[in-house]
């Protein structure tokens, strides 16, 4: 009994004592994080040996450079050798490390600008080298020019067997305009067909570069490549920048990650950027919290800071989800510093100059095609997209590209990476309509081109885009090339010999002629020795009209095209003869016509199946014979008037095939 009373007394006193809460009690919840840390800041990690070495390098020992070359002159292979020499990647077995896309490896071209950071010890001091591997083709000129803006110098690479080509010339002038220090490099000197002396002579005559300063290498075998890195350190100037000034960051390129959103490739001109910083775009006005910063070494390697002079990557948290927000050439700065800095020069929106329509072969595949196109658009903000519908081919898309190679690469990626079965219409270019009320309209879809009555009553002028084309080729093909350019409505601007046997020819050409397999015809005229580059040359007044394909007087909407008046009849004849091959015979006569407005320029007729109505008739019954034939003729007229021509989907696919 006494024990029970003591227990009750102890419990009562315990209840009356002040409570002391444990750290895990509900009134005082445990917090496993410090609330004073910004929500986007990275957890502090031990500083790596790589980051320690980079932090010890001052900006005067930074070198940002790129490789300027024609397509297939060995840019990506030379990049591999430089990465191996600096220990960034292991030697042996590397092939085009900076070419990430399947289509880049398959075609041997660079489509997306890539970068890699290298550490190089020269005379006992560490140097931080940033190599930017740029596209060589004119279609990707926006990426090329922004890549050049992030560099202080360039290796001007020329194939020893092919010599200076059109894109070498075009990219040289882009690099020269950016003020880059150019180092001449002759590649592929190990080939039996190599002629380095001729290549050096061309570089001296065309670019006024000293042949004695050139480095002769073989990127494939590694011959003399080790001489390039000391040349880069000695000849290419260090970037200019101040890490104490407000942040000025140039967007060089971007790509999309499923987990991180849009990742930006950037060059820091002033200031520095860290994870947790609040930055904004001067072009769009949008603001973001930085989630991570780092360098490409050669993959994404996180760093605590990117400072003035460096080239690296950043992504945001929350993520940037729309690639259209990442505009190449845009300037970023910290929020609050927008009025303290000037935007970096050269920003311009990419303009689509080649348009195609894409339709699924099977109409039920439209959702898959839409999803595939949207996924590819995440990595390419320069493509324009618009849904459209055709009575002949069903639902599809009208896509705008920078050029024909850009279009071809996108089509290859759509088929290879997403397994899309598609019908692509021939490429078209935009046209400008100037109305009588002063309004100007850009037409990118032939279906929206004004009809004949509207052209006469309401339109003042029609214009089409022209380009200045630069062609390089051996002198023996000069006559053929001039003939080709003249037949494509070209106007000669200049002709010069930059060696005894090589010619640079400049022509102004309509862009519509250029996208109509002009390069293929040029290669055929010169046995593959010619190269081509071009730049926009503005709009010109032109006599253009809409050519339509009619089947039994009904327009086929998917096949209409805007052409020059001088070519309407020739193209119309080609259309009707080709379309006739793919249309099945019907029970009635099928008339295929090509028309410009009300004017028929070409015609083909598909004869109907013939039923022998005289089979059971007595040979001598002439009156009955005539009566049956007249009746059959009348029946066919009625059938033709009310019957619809059945055109198989595969007929359009075959007709539109290249």
Curated annotation (Swiss-Prot):
This is Translation factor GUF1, mitochondrial. Residues 1-40 form a transit peptide. Residues 60-240 form the tr-type G domain. Its EC number is 3.6.5.-. GO terms for molecular function: GTP binding; GTPase activity; mitochondrial ribosome binding. Keywords: GTP-binding, Hydrolase, Membrane, Mitochondrion, Mitochondrion inner membrane, Nucleotide-binding, Protein biosynthesis, Transit peptide. The keyword Transit peptide applies. It is a peripheral membrane protein. It is found in: Mitochondrion inner membrane. GO terms for biological process: positive regulation of translation; translation. It comes from Paracoccidioides lutzii (strain ATCC MYA-826 / Pb01). GTP binds at residues 69-76, 133-137, 187-190. Promotes mitochondrial protein synthesis. May act as a fidelity factor of the translation reaction, by catalyzing a one-codon backward translocation of tRNAs on improperly translocated ribosomes. Binds to mitochondrial ribosomes in a GTP-dependent manner. It catalyses: GTP + H2O = GDP + phosphate + H(+). CDD domains: EF4_II (cd03699), EF4_III (cd16260), LepA (cd01890), lepA_C (cd03709). Its main location: mitochondrion. It holds the Pfam family LepA_C. It is an enzyme of class 3 (hydrolase). InterPro entries: EF-4, EFG_III/V, EFG_V-like, G_TR_CS, LepA_C_sf, LepA_CTD, LepA_IV, P-loop_NTPase.
């Amino acid at each position: 009994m006494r024990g029970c009373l003591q227990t009750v007394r102890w419990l009562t006193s315990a209840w009356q004592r002040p409570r002391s809460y444990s750290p895990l009690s509900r009134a005082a919840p445990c917090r496993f994080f410090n609330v004073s840390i910004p929500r986007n800041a990275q957890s502090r990690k031990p500083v790596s040996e790589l980051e320690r070495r980079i932090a010890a390098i001052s900006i005067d020992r930074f070198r940002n450079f790129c490789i300027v070359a024609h397509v297939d002159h060995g840019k990506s292979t030379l990049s591999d050798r430089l990465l191996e020499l600096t220990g960034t990647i292991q030697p042996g077995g590397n092939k085009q490390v900076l070419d990430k896309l399947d289509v880049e490896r398959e075609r041997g071209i660079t489509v997306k600008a890539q970068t890699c950071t290298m550490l190089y010890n020269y005379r006992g001091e560490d140097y931080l080298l940033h190599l930017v591997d740029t596209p060589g083709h004119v279609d990707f000129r926006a990426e090329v020019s922004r890549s050049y803006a992030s560099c202080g110098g360039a290796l001007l690479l020329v194939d020893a067997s092919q010599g200076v080509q059109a894109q070498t010339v075009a990219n040289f002038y882009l690099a020269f305009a950016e003020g880059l220090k150019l180092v001449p490099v002759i590649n592929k000197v190990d080939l039996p067909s190599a002629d380095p002396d001729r290549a050096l002579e061309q570089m001296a005559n065309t670019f006024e570069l000293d042949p004695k300063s050139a480095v002769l290498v073989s990127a494939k075998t590694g011959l003399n490549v080790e001489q390039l890195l000391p040349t880069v350190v000695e000849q290419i100037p260090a970037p200019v920048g101040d890490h104490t000034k407000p942040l000025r960051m140039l967007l060089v390129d971007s790509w999309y990650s499923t987990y991180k959103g849009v990742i930006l490739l950037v060059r820091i001109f002033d200031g520095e950027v860290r994870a947790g910083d609040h930055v904004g775009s001067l072009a769009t006005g949008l603001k973001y919290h930085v989630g991570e910063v780092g360098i490409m070494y050669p993959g994404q390697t996180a760093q605590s800071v990117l400072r003035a002079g460096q080239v690296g990557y950043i992504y945001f948290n929350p993520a940037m989800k729309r690639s259209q927000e990442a505009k190449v050439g845009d300037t970023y700065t910290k929020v609050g510093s927008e009025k303290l800095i000037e935007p970096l020069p050269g920003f311009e929106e990419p303009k689509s100059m080649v348009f195609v329509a894409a339709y699924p072969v099977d109409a039920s595949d439209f959702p898959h095609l839409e999803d595939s196109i949207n996924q590819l658009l995440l990595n390419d903000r320069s493509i324009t997209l618009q849904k459209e519908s055709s009575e002949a081919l069903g639902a599809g898309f009208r896509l705008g590209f920078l050029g024909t190679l850009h279009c071809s690469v996108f089509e290859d990626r759509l088929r290879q990476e997403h397994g899309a079965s598609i019908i692509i219409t021939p490429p078209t270019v935009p046209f400008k309509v100037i109305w009588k009320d002063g309004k100007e309209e850009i037409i990118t879809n032939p279906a929206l081109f004004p009809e004949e009555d509207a052209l006469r009553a309401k339109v003042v002028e029609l214009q089409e885009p022209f380009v200045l084309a630069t062609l390089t080729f051996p002198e023996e093909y000069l006559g053929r090339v001039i003939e080709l350019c003249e037949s494509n409505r070209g106007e000669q601007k200049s002709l010069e010999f930059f060696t005894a046997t090589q010619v640079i020819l400049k022509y102004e050409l309509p862009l519509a002629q250029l996208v109509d397999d002009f390069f293929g015809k040029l290669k055929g005229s010169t046995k593959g020795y010619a190269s081509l580059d071009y730049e926009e040359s503005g709009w010109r007044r032109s006599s253009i009209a809409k050519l339509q394909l009619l089947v039994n007087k009904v327009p086929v909407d998917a096949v209409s095209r805007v052409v020059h008046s001088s070519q309407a009849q020739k193209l119309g004849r080609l259309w009707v003869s080709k379309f006739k091959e793919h249309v099945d015979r019907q029970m009635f006569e099928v008339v295929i016509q090509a028309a410009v407005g009300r004017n028929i320029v070409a015609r083909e007729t598909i004869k109907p199946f013939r039923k022998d109505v005289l089979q059971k008739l007595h040979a001598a019954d002439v009156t009955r014979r005539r009566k049956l034939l007249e009746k059959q003729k009348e029946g066919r007229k009625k059938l033709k008037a009310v019957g619809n021509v059945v055109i198989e989907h595969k007929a359009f696919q075959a007709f539109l095939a290249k």
